[in-house]
C-alpha cells in the first residue's frame, strides 16, 4: 500500500489555478453565507447537525493546506476545534442529546471520524488525535453494549469508518479497533447480494440502488484488505463491471438521479457520486496498485468533475446529463427518476443540499494522490503539475512534475536528491498512450508503468512524451462519442445564462451564489457525417476547463439530423434521432472537452457507417 504525502505536496500550474478558483467560489465561502455550515449544530447553532459540516470540511481542509492559505487554514482549524470542544465526557461527538443516540444515524460518526483523521494527517494536533480516539472508542463501546447500531445511511456506508480506524491503528494499535471494524462489517450492508436490484432502473428511491452509496461501496474490499489484512477477491471489480454494464456513462460514471437510472444519455448523475467515485478510485489504486483504478479516476476527474460546475465554481448542478441541451426547470413532472425538476440547474443548492456540502473534496484529493510514496521509492500516479518533498530511506528527496496534462501529452519530471540515493521511481502511463518515450527514446511500459531503479544524484530531469489519436467510441445506445486521450469531447451549444435570485426555507440565493437556468441559443441536433477528426491545441486558460477558451478542441464534420424531444418534454432530447439520414448540409464544427461544455451533445449518431 502506498503513502499519501499530505502536507508535503503542493499544486502548481493549471491545478493550482483550479484550486484557487475553487477557494474563491462556494468552497471558500460556505461558512460565511450558507446556514447549514455557518449556523450548524456542530458549532452550537440551530441548523443541520449531521453530515453537512463534516462533508464540507472533508474538502475544505485539504484545499486550505494545498494552497497554504492562512485564512482558509485558520477557518478550517476553528471549525475542527469547535467540534472537538463540544465532545461529551464519554467520547460521543455528534450534536445530539444522550437520549437521541439510539435513533441518530451513525453515518455522521463515521464521517466526522474520517474528517478528524484527515486533519491530523496535515497537522500534529494531539487534542484532535485524542478526540478521534475517544470518538471511535465510544462508538465501539456503545455498539458492543447494543445501545446503538447501524441503520439507514450508516448501514450502507459502514466501510467509511475503517478510514479513521486505520489512522488510529497505524499509530497505536489496540484490539478494540479491529473489533469495531468487525462490528461495522457485520452490521453493514452486503453489497454483493444486491446485484439483482441493479439489473434495470426503477422509479423508486431505495438505499440499495442509491448512486452515492454504490460509488462509495466500490472501495470496501480495498479498505478491508488494508485494515484487516484480507486477501483480495476481486469482488469490487466485479461489482464495478455490473454497474458499468447496466448504468455506465460515456464519462466513466454511472447514472443515478438519485438511484440507478440505466444507460440513457439524458438521465442524470449526481455530483456527490462524482466526487465519491473519485475518492473510491484513489483508495483502490493506493491499495491494489492496479492501474485500471487510476484510469477510471482520470476519466471521471477530467470530464464529469469540471462539467458540473460553472467556470467560477460558484454554481454547481445536482445532476449532470451526457446529452444536456438545456438546464431549465421542468414545468410538470421531472425527467429524473427520483430527483426534482431543478436538479440540473446550476446554483447554490439545486434539488438538495448534500452536493453543496460534499462537492469540495474532488480536486483537492486528486492533487494529494498525484505523487505517492511506495515501499521502495516514489510513484507519479497522475501527470499533474505538482511538487513534493519527502524522505526515502531517511534521505531528502524533492520531485516536481511540470505538465499541462490532460490537455497535452508530455511532462517534465525533475528529481532532486543530493545524497546519491538509490530508489525506484515509477511513472504510471495511461492505457491509451502510444509511442511512449523517455528523453526521446522508446520507453518500456510494463503493467501500465515505467519503472526506473537507479541511484539519483543531484538534479535530474526526465521528459515523458506520449501520443494519442482522436477516435470514436460506441455506446450502448448505438451512438458514438469522441475521445482523445482521457478527454471526452462534446458539441457545445451556445448558451444564455438566466439568473434566478430568491430565498427559500431561509436560504438566500443572490449573486454570486444565485441559481442559473441555461437556455440553448443554437441548434443541437447533429450527427457525425464522416470519420474526420482533427485535434487543435490552444493556450491553457486561467480557467483550465474554460467554457469559452478550451485548451484543446477537435474539428469534426457534422450534419443536422431529425432528432425529436423525449416524450412529454421540450428540453430533453430523445435518446436517439429519428433517422440516420441528414436533413441538411455537412458542416465543419468544433468539439470541445466535455468538462468545458455546460450545454452539449456528446453521444451522436454516425450518419455513415465507418470501418474502425
Model-based region annotation:
Residues 10-18, 68-85, 104, 123-142, ...:
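Extended, well-ordered alpha-helical scaffold segments
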Residues 37-53, 94-112, 144-158, 190-219, ...:
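Solvent-exposed loop and edge beta-strand segments that line ligand/cofactor-binding
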Residues 433-454, 470-477:
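Solvent-exposed beta-strand/loop surfaces of large extracellular or lumenal domains
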Residues 236, 295-303, 308-411, 465-612:
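C-terminal beta-rich recognition modules with glycine/proline-rich loops and embedded aromatic residues
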Residues 1-52, 70-93, 126, 182:
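Low-complexity, Ser/Thr/Pro/Gly-enriched N-terminal "stalk/linker" regions
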Residues 223-246, 265-314, 324-325:
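Catalytic-core region of carbohydrate-active enzymes that cleave or remodel glycosidic bonds
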Residues 420-440:
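Beta-strand-rich binding/interaction modules
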Residues 13-15, 57-70, 111-125, 160-173, ...:
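Well-ordered alpha-helical scaffold segments within catalytic/enzyme domains
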Amino acid at each position: 500500500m502506498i503513502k499519501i504525502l499530505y502536507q508535503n505536496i503542493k499544486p502548481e500550474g493549471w491545478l493550482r489555478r483550479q484550486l484557487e478558483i475553487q477557494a474563491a467560489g462556494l468552497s471558500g465561502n460556505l461558512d460565511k453565507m450558507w446556514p447549514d455550515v455557518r449556523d450548524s449544530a456542530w458549532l452550537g447553532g440551530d441548523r443541520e447537525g449531521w453530515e453537512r459540516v463534516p462533508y464540507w470540511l472533508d474538502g475544505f481542509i485539504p484545499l486550505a493546506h494545498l494552497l497554504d492559505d492562512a485564512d482558509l487554514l485558520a477557518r478550517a482549524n476553528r471549525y475542527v476545534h469547535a467540534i472537538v470542544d463540544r465532545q461529551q465526557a464519554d467520547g460521543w461527538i455528534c450534536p445530539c442529546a444522550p437520549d437521541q443516540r439510539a435513533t441518530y444515524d451513525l453515518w455522521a460518526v463515521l464521517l466526522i471520524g474520517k474528517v478528524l483523521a484527515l486533519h491530523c494527517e496535515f497537522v500534529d494536533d494531539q487534542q484532535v488525535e485524542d478526540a478521534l480516539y475517544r470518538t471511535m472508542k465510544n462508538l465501539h463501546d456503545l455498539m458492543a453494549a447494543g445501545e446503538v447500531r447501524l441503520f439507514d445511511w450508516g448501514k450502507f456506508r459502514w466501510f467509511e469508518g475503517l478510514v479513521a480506524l486505520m489512522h488510529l491503528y497505524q499509530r497505536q494499535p489496540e484490539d478494540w479497533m479491529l473489533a469495531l471494524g468487525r462490528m461495522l462489517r457485520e452490521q453493514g450492508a452486503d453489497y454483493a447480494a444486491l446485484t439483482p436490484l441493479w439489473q434495470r432502473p426503477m422509479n423508486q428511491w431505495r438505499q440499495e440502488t442509491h448512486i452515492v452509496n454504490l460509488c462509495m461501496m466500490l472501495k470496501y474490499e480495498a479498505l478491508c484488505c488494508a485494515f484487516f489484512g484480507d486477501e483480495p477477491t476481486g469482488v469490487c471489480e466485479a461489482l464495478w463491471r455490473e454497474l458499468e454494464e447496466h448504468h455506465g456513462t460515456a464519462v466513466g460514471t454511472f447514472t443515478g438521479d438519485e438511484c440507478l437510472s440505466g444507460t440513457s444519455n439524458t438521465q442524470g448523475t449526481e455530483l456527490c457520486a462524482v466526487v465519491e467515485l473519485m475518492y473510491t478510485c484513489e483508495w483502490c489504486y493506493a491499495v491494489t496498485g492496479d492501474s485500471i483504478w487510476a484510469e477510471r479516476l482520470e476519466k471521471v476527474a477530467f470530464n464529469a468533475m469540471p462539467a458540473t460546475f460553472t467556470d467560477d465554481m460558484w454554481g454547481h448542478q445536482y445532476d449532470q446529463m451526457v446529452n444536456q441541451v438545456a438546464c431549465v426547470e421542468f414545468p410538470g413532472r421531472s425527467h429524473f427518476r427520483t430527483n426534482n425538476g431543478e436538479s440540473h440547474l446550476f446554483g447554490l443548492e439545486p434539488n438538495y443540499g448534500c452536493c453543496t456540502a460534499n462537492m469540495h473534496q474532488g480536486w483537492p484529493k486528486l492533487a494529494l494522490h498525484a505523487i505517492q510514496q511506495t515501499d521502495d521509492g516514489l510513484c507519479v500516479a497522475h501527470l499533474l503539475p505538482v511538487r513534493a518533498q519527502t524522505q526515502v530511506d531517511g534521505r531528502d528527496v524533492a520531485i516536481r512534475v511540470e505538465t499541462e496534462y490532460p490537455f497535452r501529452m508530455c511532462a517534465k519530471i525533475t528529481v532532486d536528491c543530493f545524497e546519491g540515493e538509490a530508489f525506484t521511481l515509477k511513472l504510471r502511463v495511461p492505457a491509451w498512450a502510444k509511442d511512449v518515450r523517455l528523453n526521446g527514446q522508446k520507453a518500456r511500459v510494463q503493467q501500465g508503468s515505467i519503472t526506473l531503479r537507479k541511484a539519483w544524484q543531484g538534479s535530474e530531469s526526465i521528459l515523458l512524451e506520449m501520443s494519442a489519436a482522436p477516435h470514436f467510441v460506441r455506446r450502448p445506445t448505438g451512438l458514438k462519442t469522441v475521445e482523445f486521450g482521457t478527454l471526452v469531447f462534446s458539441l457545445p451549444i451556445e448558451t444564455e445564462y438566466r439568473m434566478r435570485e430568491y430565498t427559500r426555507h431561509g436560504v438566500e440565493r443572490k449573486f454570486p451564489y444565485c441559481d442559473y437556468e441555461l437556455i440553448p441559443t443554437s441548434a443541437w441536433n447533429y450527427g457525425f457525417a464522416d470519420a474526420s477528426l482533427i485535434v487543435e491545441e490552444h493556450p491553457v486558460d486561467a480557467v483550465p476547463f474554460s467554457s469559452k477558451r478550451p485548451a484543446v478542441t477537435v474539428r469534426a464534420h457534422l450534419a443536422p439530423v431529425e432528432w425529436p424531444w423525449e416524450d412529454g418534454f421540450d428540453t430533453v432530447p430523445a435518446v436517439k434521432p429519428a433517422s440516420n439520414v441528414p436533413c441538411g448540409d455537412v458542416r465543419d464544427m468544433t468539439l470541445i472537452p466535455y468538462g468545458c461544455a455546460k450545454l452539449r451533445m456528446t453521444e451522436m449518431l454516425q450518419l455513415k457507417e465507418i470501418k474502425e
